[in-house]
């Protein structure tokens, strides 16, 4: 059974504090937008889909008990608070897209004379709650589409073990802890396991925040999936000797041309995968694709505090006085990406914009 990182019922929101994992499993109460901003910014909740859901639900629990004198005041509250939540971690595009959708809804309801202020509030709450259920359904579709793509690639290869279970590598955390449930890249791993086609999954430690060691390994052990943790610096050796069938990672933002911003270290894994002829897949919902950004050069990369590199907990591990560069993400060029796995199918980066434009009827 997948872990539950987000517990929600109308008027109440709790999140699993991911900074304490894997040693302590503790839920934090999110009482409103300020709490939501803090848990996102401090990375007590992380993963682009989960950030968007927790951000939007934090506003939902804040406005649930409130009474508004007019639709205009409610609209202003929604717009101002959602834009504030976007600033908590700007690289993850899902929060911005979700905010824009909800602001558009609020504007439309404000203009509709047949909608009362209470109706408007209820419809806003319904819309935020629908995001939670949709994310889980989308993740399951991503898992199925990704597993199918990997197995088809293996079947077409010259491998003697083409028909057997596969070995895959993943990076960072893209499972139930990064989404509303099931996961994106880790959802692909889960679906392979459900099909009886997963021989082994390797996960990187993912320095400096160790999301792979702390979170992905925690999920894999919890679900008793066959897994091995490797250091970030071991990936080249791993792909050379362990017959890995595919690499599958998540994404915080995908540009229109297929360039992908994901957890720092993703780019070098893609380079190594290309060298060894291992297909490299990005698993992400359409909400992670930003068609307004032509390429990865336009993606804002969040830079985290030096302390995350120089300390483990309260213990310093780097020489005092050393300079640090700590970007949270890097951008993998589309030329290194085999396919982008979405809830609607697997697309080549070169066809991504056209396919999504057609899907969304833009």
Curated annotation (Swiss-Prot):
Native organism: Drosophila virilis
Transmembrane segments: none
Subcellular localization: Cytoplasm; Nucleus
Annotated site residues (Transition state stabilizer) in this chain: 172
GO cellular component terms, semicolon-separated: cytoplasm; nucleus
Metabolic or biological pathway: Amino-acid biosynthesis; L-methionine biosynthesis via salvage pathway; L-methionine from S-methyl-5-thio-alpha-D-ribose 1-phosphate: step 1/6
Catalytic activity: 5-(methylsulfanyl)-alpha-D-ribose 1-phosphate = 5-(methylsulfanyl)-D-ribulose 1-phosphate
Name used for this protein in its record: Methylthioribose-1-phosphate isomerase
Residues the record marks as active site: 252
